[in-house]
């Protein structure tokens, strides 16, 4: 709540069409007065059938707008057309285009780090190479998590410690609320190069996970953070200034220095 305007606090919670936190609440949706429902993100294999069925069931138009980290600018332009907010949308679209181009340029001029992004209460889930949730991980690192069937879920693919040892990354990024706080004192985790060297970090969280849970436009914060963390010389920008600009544009929030420091508390390594 500290990042969002109070006018948004009491909006109805509709649930999710996809994902792991529950189903779309049609009763709440029908009572909300919504004139259109727009789903933005990965086009699931059954997206057309799913949205057609919901549209028929509710009488409310359902629209899907595909969005990847590369095409997020175009997604905002489409949203602007749909909602009659072209000028506002273009501001956000331009930001997305320019930020993606800047970070992509960093990725193209560095030797990418051998890295894993780890999730889960036990730290035994990974976001696999080639999955929708891994877009910024794959862009900015050599994502060692190569599996036969990458999961489309934000919780990733379950593995075991033996597999983590075989991959043995140089850098580990932990999802918020994973095992970041305890691995430094765990002998088993200490067998991994990244933990031995202190090259492990917790992804920032606020108001959502910056690395993509959900995989929204907030991943642009994750891109900026990850590039600066891994390649500080190539990522020639002021991370705090970039984060502050994002919060202003997307949340209309004047991020304070204290708030920024809190967001970064576990995200720049053990001090």
Regions found by a protein language model. Give the residues of each.
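A short, structured surface patch at a secondary-structure boundary
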Residues: 1-32, 36-44, 142-145
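Extracytoplasmic substrate-binding proteins
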Residues: 48-125, 204-268
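Extracytoplasmic/secreted cell-surface and envelope-processing proteins
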Residues: 22, 45-49, 72-74, 124-128, ...
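Alpha-helical, coiled-coil/dimerization segments enriched in small aliphatic residues
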Residues: 18, 126-155
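A residue-level marker of the well-folded mature domains of exported/periplasmic proteins
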Residues: 126-127, 131-134, 158-167, 226
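Structural recognition of the beta-strand scaffold that forms the well-ordered cores
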Residues: 13-15, 36-40, 61-66, 113-119, ...
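Short, structured coil segments at secondary-structure junctions
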Residues: 57-58, 140-141, 195-196
